[in-house]
């Protein structure tokens, strides 16, 4: 999930986490995220989602059913890896811990989720929350190239960070985190100061040039999801080095 927020003046920032050395893509700066868990598709959680049905979500992703689980997974992973919970209270207001006692309860819920406990539905029920699935914009679909030993089928989403919550990495799978303008992140990558992988780079390029998060989300939500193509890079050896190509680039269909 590309977690974004407005900055003073014009423009926006995106939240990046540095992967721990022991994990896949160790040392790289990536977006928070992970796999869809079994609980994400539970009926209990479906009833706790605001504004998006499984039919709508599945249609957007081009699958028969189960699409809403991706929206739920985005919110869960955002909470696990960034400490940001995209949710509404029962009165319709955005969730924001009211006091230290409530904040401590949610720190404990996050800890349990990071330990693998399927407690998202329990948390929503006990705290009377609804997941803000209507505040996500579906952005991109990437598949890991065939040369990789581990392959992933990944959907990317955009979400606006709510005011009043502070994003922070989990200290386990991620060891550092930054808020940074997408243009600055790309510049630091070019200068060798920030390690990033191709999907991160290309998705950052896709959110450059927007004046604020409202403009970004409105633009991405206006795109017909059927027009979001699946991107599967191809890598091949040239002069002793791997060269990567994307669909539509010259030479892609030759490999």
Regions found by a protein language model. Name each.
Residues 1-255:
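N-terminal leader/linker segments that precede catalytic domains of diphosphate-processing enzymes
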């Amino acid at each position: 999930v590309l977690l974004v927020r407005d900055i003073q003046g014009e423009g926006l920032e995106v939240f990046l986490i540095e992967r721990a050395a022991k994990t896949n893509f160790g040392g790289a700066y990536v977006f928070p995220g992970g796999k869809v868990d079994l609980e994400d598709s539970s009926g209990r959680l479906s009833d706790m989602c605001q504004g998006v049905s499984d039919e709508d979500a599945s249609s957007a992703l081009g699958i028969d059913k189960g699409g809403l689980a991706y929206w739920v997974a985005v919110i869960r992973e955002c909470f696990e890896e960034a400490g940001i919970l995209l949710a509404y209270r029962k009165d319709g207001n955005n969730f924001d811990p009211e006091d230290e006692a409530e904040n401590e309860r949610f720190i404990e819920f996050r800890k349990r989720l990071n330990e693998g406990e399927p407690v998202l539905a329990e948390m929503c029920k006990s705290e009377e929350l609804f997941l803000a699935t209507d505040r996500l914009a579906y952005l991109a679909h990437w598949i890991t190239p065939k040369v990789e030993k581990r392959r992933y089928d990944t959907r990317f989403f955009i979400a606006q960070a709510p005011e009043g919550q502070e994003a922070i990495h989990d200290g386990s799978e991620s060891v550092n985190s930054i808020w940074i303008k997408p243009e600055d992140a790309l510049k630091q990558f070019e200068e060798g100061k920030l390690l990033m992988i191709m999907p991160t780079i290309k998705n950052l390029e896709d959110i450059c040039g927007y004046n604020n998060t409202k403009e970004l989300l409105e633009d991405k939500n206006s795109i017909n999801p059927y027009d979001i193509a699946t991107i599967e890079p191809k890598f091949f050896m040239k002069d002793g080095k791997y060269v990567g190509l994307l669909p539509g680039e010259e030479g892609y269909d030759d490999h």
